């Protein structure tokens, strides 16, 4: 029976790993050297393949290999019924199969090929990974005019083996007629760069942002054959933004080639004009912002201590107006409600911007592509994305900059209802709070609303169109009135000034906003995999305690409704299904028996890490290490997938046993 290509590749990989483990190649070299010395002394004799095989058989090496490479007869049957496992050595050395794509013959395409990497000196001492050995990998993510791509992972090395090609449609969406192909002049007016984001994934699955680069591709418009090669130097991020991390050799090719090319002088002139126009707009906005700030300080000198953030640095330490980080973002079919959008942002990982040495909170607001590809970011990254999504759903949303407990700087999102209702959204938890201001002039006997939110002070709010600074006598959130049209309470910036540097297409230097991508994770497969790993970890843990383990599959299944109810509550704020869950548990636990359950939530899929966290809870440790008569254990895992690689992982451990006291 012929194996499918993916199974044949996996089989080759397993055989290769087994041969490597047994060092068959080394044994063959030893036999070859010995045979040449002892049996083939004369120059006239030549060592044939048959002679070498005979020598290998005589030494028992062939028999040893065949004994090791044994395959069970029912393996094919098991593969049809169980979840297919990937090859243990996941780095595919075979040539990648070409994937068919729909190419519009009336459109122009840019084929970007990443040929290889050079001078990644941080990995100079790293050797090539052995087959089956886990290793850190590089992944390259691209975005160009609403198109996103991701390379296959390659092992981290001084010269990483990047070999990937990406077909980019040049005049996507609005530019160009449907029946007219973009010419060189039209393409020269497209100032969108190709954004490259390089990620590093370590052996535990943690991702690190290595570099974020904007590639200017329009030099190809001046080449005769529509082909050019570039050496793209990648710089680090944050405090290392001036340090080179490596070089990518890139080949650009236009399909179909241009009938008429442009001179390099014309291209350089266009790029120079764009830079000059951008610099002038940025200069004028800076002049205006300084004047606006002086006016704000004249209202009340104490305003100097309020958190009024006009500019923020991105991962490349480029200063940009905060309004440029916001733009209405529609999620298409990926998210259905604003609350689901808040849940999606909540399950993206939280990680403070890295810093070298001590000091205050580091400044780094990531571009949207870098945040989405890394799948984690700081509080500001979460807030910016949530605000973009809420604007996309038609809400009047703003990012708030202020402080929470102990004076710690913090950001959150605010929406203003048509009826004037103010709602705060915490991007890191998905919680929502209704704001009802306290009137400090009311007499003491008047009952005041008690705020439930953790926010203490607020300095400013902003969106993609507006920037307003808090000019009320007190900046405490609980007494603030959020009537943003009242200029006596909120000092606005000129919307025209903001538009000149923050609206789409206003500046060539503005990073374009990428679309969201659907999840590539299979929820059922991921749930099964994590659950199996947790069962093994529990088994090992109890074995160390000299305890036997008996699993109750039916009880495990009955935990599913509880996990579903928890996720629904996190998404909608409504609790449902708890009565049915409790009734089923009562029926499953006999009289005289005790039931204990422990649910916990994660935003990663690392089973060992999750298990270690669970054991730190005394209540969970009591369940996992439980002793008793007729003791049965249960565990249920449910993975809920969201756009990108985001997921909510719910785990519930439970046990039932008969009380003997």
Curated annotation (Swiss-Prot):
Gene3D superfamilies: 3.10.620.30. It comes from the Eukaryota. Pfam families: CEP76-C2, CEP76_C, CEP76_N, CEPT76_peptidase. The keyword Thylakoid does not apply. InterPro entries: CEP76 (IPR052299), CEP76-C2 (IPR028926), CEP76_C (IPR056288), CEP76_N (IPR056289), CEPT76/DRC7_peptidase-like_dom (IPR056290), Papain-like_cys_pep_sf (IPR038765). It is found in: Cytoplasm, Cytoskeleton, Microtubule organizing center, Centrosome; Cytoplasm, Cytoskeleton, Microtubule organizing center, Centrosome, Centriole. Keywords: Cytoplasm, Cytoskeleton. GO terms for biological process: regulation of centriole replication. GO terms for cellular component: centriole; centrosome; cytoplasm. Its main location: cytoplasm. Centrosomal protein involved in regulation of centriole duplication. Required to limit centriole duplication to once per cell cycle by preventing centriole reduplication. Belongs to the CEP76 family. PANTHER family: CENTROSOMAL PROTEIN OF 76 KDA. This is Centrosomal protein of 76 kDa.
